[in-house]
């Protein structure tokens, strides 16, 4: 069975993560499952309000699951330490993929928020992202906040981090390939094509798609099986018009760091982004 665990804070993000998970498995419902987990800090929950809190937390995601005709299992927990709890549940629960959202608030007033087009607010120079990456510089440390970084470092399984720009569907997906390490992304492309009939465009940033045997053969077999669902571009310049048509960018964690460090101008036009670590 292919088992996905979604951990969400707010309802909108939970719905986006569910749409994404559904796109990865919807034709394989007998051999897959989705668990949606909401964690609350213990001091916000007491025995009197726990049921109400649980109902409110899942109301919208359950409605969304009915629209998608997707069964889900829900898990609600009160905990003192949300990051540790997410990693523990993921590591001990026999899951194949953990999906979490990256809060928009993290980007407010940061340079990265501006770079990826999530905030237009003027930046306060004192705050210059220094909590975001430690003091050493713009992105050397990690293009993630502390919470996400803790979850990534503690989780011993594949993890996807969604930067959610109101993701509605995953019909058009764009995958930049930066290095031979990115070959695992082809597995996700295949899942989306098979389960969701997604159209996938691969961007060959450094020419690996032709020179790397593993990647080339994986893509060749996908092209033979699904000629209408896969396209390649070798253009270094990604146009805004192209990005505007995409629902999601799928990228590995290493390539995300490279992309952010390169400050590519097109970053501000990216759609929702799923950053994958395997």
Model feature map: region roles:
Residues 20, 60, 85, 147, ...:
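Well-ordered alpha-helical segments embedded in enzymatic catalytic cores
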Residues 43, 208-212:
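Short, small-residue-enriched loops and turns at beta-alpha junctions
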Residues 30, 90, 94-95, 199, ...:
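Short loop/turn motifs at secondary-structure junctions
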Residues 1-14, 102-209, 220-278:
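Intrinsically disordered or low-complexity boundary/linker segments at protein termini
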Residues 34-43, 47-104, 113-114:
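Soluble catalytic regions of membrane-associated enzymes that act on cell-envelope
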Residues 51-61, 144-148, 215-219:
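Amphipathic alpha-helical segments in well-structured domains
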Residues 1-58, 69, 182-184, 193-197:
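Non-transmembrane accessory domains of multi-pass membrane transporters/channels
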């Amino acid at each position: 069975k292919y088992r996905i665990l979604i951990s969400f804070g707010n309802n909108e993000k939970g719905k986006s993560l569910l749409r994404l998970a559904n796109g990865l498995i919807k034709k394989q419902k007998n051999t897959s499952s989705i668990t949606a987990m909401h964690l609350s800090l213990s001091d916000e929950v007491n025995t009197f309000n726990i049921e109400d809190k649980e109902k409110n937390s899942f109301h919208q995601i359950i409605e969304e699951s009915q629209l998608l005709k997707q069964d889900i299992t829900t898990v609600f927990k009160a905990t003192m330490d949300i990051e540790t709890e997410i990693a523990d549940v993921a590591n001990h629960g026999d899951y194949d993929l953990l999906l979490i959202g990256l809060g928009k608030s993290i980007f407010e007033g940061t340079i990265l928020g501006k770079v990826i087009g999530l905030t237009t607010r003027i930046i306060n120079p004192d705050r210059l992202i220094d909590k975001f990456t430690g003091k050493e510089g713009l992105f050397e440390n990690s293009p993630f906040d502390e919470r996400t970084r803790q979850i990534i470092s503690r989780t011993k399984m594949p993890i996807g981090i969604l930067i959610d720009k109101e993701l509605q569907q995953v019909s058009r997906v764009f995958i930049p390939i930066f290095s031979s390490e990115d070959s695992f992304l082809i597995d996700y492309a295949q899942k989306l094509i098979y389960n969701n009939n997604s159209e996938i465009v691969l961007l060959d940033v450094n020419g690996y798609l032709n020179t790397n045997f593993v990647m080339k053969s994986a893509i060749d077999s996908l092209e033979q099986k699904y000629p209408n669902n896969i396209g390649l571009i070798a253009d270094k310049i990604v146009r805004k018009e192209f990005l505007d048509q995409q629902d999601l960018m799928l990228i590995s964690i290493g390539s995300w760091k490279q992309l952010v460090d390169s400050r590519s101008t097109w970053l501000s036009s990216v759609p929702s982004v799923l950053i994958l670590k395997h």
